[in-house]
Amino acid sequence: MANDRVPMTPAGEQALRAELDKLKKIERPAIIEAIAEARDHGDLKENAEYHAARERQGIIEGRIKDIESKLSNAQVIDVTKIQANGMVIFGATVTIMNVDTEEETTYKIVGEDEADIDNQKISVVAPLARALIKKEEGDEITLDTPKGKVTYEIVAVEYK
């Protein structure tokens, strides 16, 4: 599975590239400087600043490798360039209505690393997203939730 392509929106790719750029151009040089400065303080065995800086360096280098791996495996999908004809696909913004409460909620279906429920972005592998994929406006889906079965109607499908 390590070589499988992972779907990602253009915004998700841009965010990862920005983070990678910051890590490489700002964080990495700053930590190298902090390590050099801590080294100048003498005995490394009891030098807390040195050990903290080395630990931080490991975290930064690990994150850089993680982002580079994600970007190399990313399949960037720009939903605005796909003719989906009203069908829910990866990258679509979907408004659903709970048929019992008539409460409407809008979600964007994104890659796993982009998911952010506070900003109404759900992972393509989430149960709700999986149920919505390939459905169309007017269709209904039923999900098993901890509170029992919930039925939603797809109110709108947008590609933005």
From Swiss-Prot:
This is Transcription elongation factor GreA. One of its GO terms (molecular function) is DNA binding. The keyword Endoplasmic reticulum does not apply. Coiled coil: none annotated. Disulfide bonds: none annotated. Keywords: DNA-binding, Transcription, Transcription regulation. The keyword Transcription applies. Transmembrane segments: none annotated. SUPFAM superfamilies: FKBP-like, GreA transcript cleavage protein, N-terminal domain. One of its GO terms (biological process) is DNA-templated transcription elongation. Pfam families: GreA_GreB (PF01272), GreA_GreB_N (PF03449). Necessary for efficient RNA polymerase transcription elongation past template-encoded arresting sites. The arresting sites in DNA have the property of trapping a certain fraction of elongating RNA polymerases that pass through, resulting in locked ternary complexes. Cleavage of the nascent transcript by cleavage factors such as GreA or GreB allows the resumption of elongation from the new 3'terminus. GreA releases sequences of 2 to 3 nucleotides. Belongs to the GreA/GreB family.
